[in-house]
Amino acid sequence: FARSAWRNGEFKNYNTLDLYYVGYGGNDNGTTRFREYHGEYYGVDDAKIKPILKEYTDAAHLLKPNHWYEVKIRVENGATTYAMDGEELFSLPVADGKGDGYFALRLWQNHVRFADFQVANIDNLK
């Protein structure tokens, strides 16, 4: 997609995207955050470019070693939701035209294995 070669996987370059982002166990496993990126560039205050919509810092919402997680990301009925092990952590109404159907998994300084990974149209699951 546009400018992906320029971004080159550098985290700071993600500021230029218009997206929602969950950082689960970020900041050396000190925070779990939900952010909305507004597609701005450098020199703009981070709180304006990528405001934190909700944040957890308690141990129950940080990564645990040797634990298999069930993650569900859903976009339906005008909202996007993120649930971990059956607990809905984040939910946000999404305006028409917001979001373009892309999602990504970004992994950094961790050891991750995926099992039973699925992407599905919710209408086909009903």
Tell what function each PLM region has:
Residues 1-126:
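Extracellular glycan-recognition regions
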